[in-house]
């Protein structure tokens, strides 16, 4: 009788978790299912995979199998386990063989741990303005239903009315327990995960909890200072442009950024100096007067300097 290497059959490692093993089982069950596979040994491989899954999916059976595998070269194990008849060990022999080798006291009453269905992820687009308050959203998705061989039998359309909390961030995951796929063996449903995607905004860029907005100003507003109206997520504010402001300068508006449970970010106004269109004769004369008055000013004097 031969003790099979169930981990090798499943293509996994002994250290892999149940989720990884279950994924491997589903993949192999689909690959070798006799109704699907064209390979000549598909039926035998399918039974072998099912046998491996029967043991490795049960927490206690897996622990007992690991113990048997660890002792497979021990003399006591060989005397009890190998009969020289060339037969292969299978999952049906498991209980009797384990008890004969390690004794009944080594076994404990066990129940197969409840498996659970697959989780589902759905990306949900949220506008920046919607992050300020809790709001309701209708979510529609297809719920896959798997058979015992890990293949999708059907997809059921499903619609939920969910609450999106205030202060959600890009990439945040919201769990809806039990709204995933049902387990094919009668275990609990998986979960539905809503993955938040903050939609691009035409005015604001997100930098952590802060927001940035480009504010166009005229050359004279930058030079002389001004007060300009700037939008925020909630309302418009009057922003003070200091005299002598430079292009690219960032002006902080405290508390006007993104809101979360932990903190409120700031809004940064990034100044962009916008030149007027091609000047007429009178405007050109005024620019010339300014150039003459500032003849000693060289905007490129610091080029190449650290």
UniProtKB/Swiss-Prot annotation:
GO BP annotations listed = chaperone cofactor-dependent protein refolding; protein refolding
The residues covered by the J domain are 5-69
- Main function: DNA-binding protein that preferentially recognizes a curved DNA sequence. It is probably a functional analog of DnaJ; displays overlapping activities with DnaJ, but functions under different conditions, probably acting as a molecular chaperone in an adaptive response to environmental stresses other than heat shock. Lacks autonomous chaperone activity; binds native substrates and targets them for recognition by DnaK. Its activity is inhibited by the binding of CbpM.
An example of a Pfam family matching this protein is DnaJ
Q: Which Gene3D superfamilies match?
A: DnaJ domain (1.10.287.110), Single helix bin (1.20.5.460), Urease metallochaperone UreE, N-terminal domain (2.60.260.20)
Q: Which cysteines does the record link by disulfide bonds?
A: none
**Record HAMAP family:** CbpA (MF_01154)
Regions that span the bilayer: none
PROSITE patterns per UniProt? DNAJ_1, DNAJ_2
Q: What is this protein called?
A: Curved DNA-binding protein
Q: What are the UniProt keywords, alphabetically?
A: Chaperone, Cytoplasm, DNA-binding
Enumerate the subcellular locations listed in this protein's record, separating them with semicolons: Cytoplasm, Nucleoid
Keyword Protein biosynthesis listed? The answer is no
GO terms, molecular function? bent DNA binding; unfolded protein binding
Q: Which organism is it from?
A: Shigella boydii serotype 18 (strain CDC 3083-94 / BS512)
Q: Which PANTHER family match?
A: DNAJ HOMOLOG 1, MITOCHONDRIAL-RELATED
* One term under GO cellular component: cytoplasm
């Amino acid at each position: 009788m031969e003790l099979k290497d169930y981990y090798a059959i499943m293509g996994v490692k002994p250290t892999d978790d149940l989720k990884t093993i279950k994924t491997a089982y589903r993949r192999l069950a689909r690959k070798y299912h006799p109704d699907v596979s064209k390979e000549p040994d598909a039926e035998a491989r399918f039974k072998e995979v099912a046998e491996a899954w029967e043991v490795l999916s049960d927490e206690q059976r897996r622990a007992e199998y690991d113990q048997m595998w660890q002792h497979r070269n021990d003399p006591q194990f060989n005397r009890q386990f190998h009969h020289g008849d060339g037969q292969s060990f299978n999952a049906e022999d498991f209980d009797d063989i384990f008890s004969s080798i390690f004794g009944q006291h080594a076994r404990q009453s066990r129940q197969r741990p409840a498996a659970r269905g697959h989780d589902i992820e759905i990306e949900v687009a949220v506008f920046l303005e919607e992050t300020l308050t809790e709001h309701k959203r209708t979510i529609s998705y297809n719920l896959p239903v798997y058979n015992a061989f890990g293949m999708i039998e059907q997809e059921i359309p499903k619609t939920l009315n969910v609450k999106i909390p205030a202060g959600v961030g890009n990439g945040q995951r919201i769990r809806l327990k039990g709204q995933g796929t049902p387990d094919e063996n009668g275990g609990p449903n998986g979960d539905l995960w809503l993955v938040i995607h903050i939609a691009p905004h035409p005015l604001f860029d997100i930098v952590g909890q802060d927001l940035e907005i480009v504010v166009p100003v005229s050359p004279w507003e930058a030079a002389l200072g001004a007060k300009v109206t700037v939008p925020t997520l909630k309302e418009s504010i009057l922003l003070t442009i200091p005299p002598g402001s430079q292009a690219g300068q960032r002006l902080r508006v405290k508390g006007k950024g993104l809101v979360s449970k932990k903190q409120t970010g700031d809004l940064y106004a990034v100044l962009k100096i916008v030149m007027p269109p091609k000047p007429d004769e009178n405007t050109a004369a005024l620019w010339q007067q300014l150039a003459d008055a500032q003849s000693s000013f060289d905007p490129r004097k610091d080029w190449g300097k650290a």
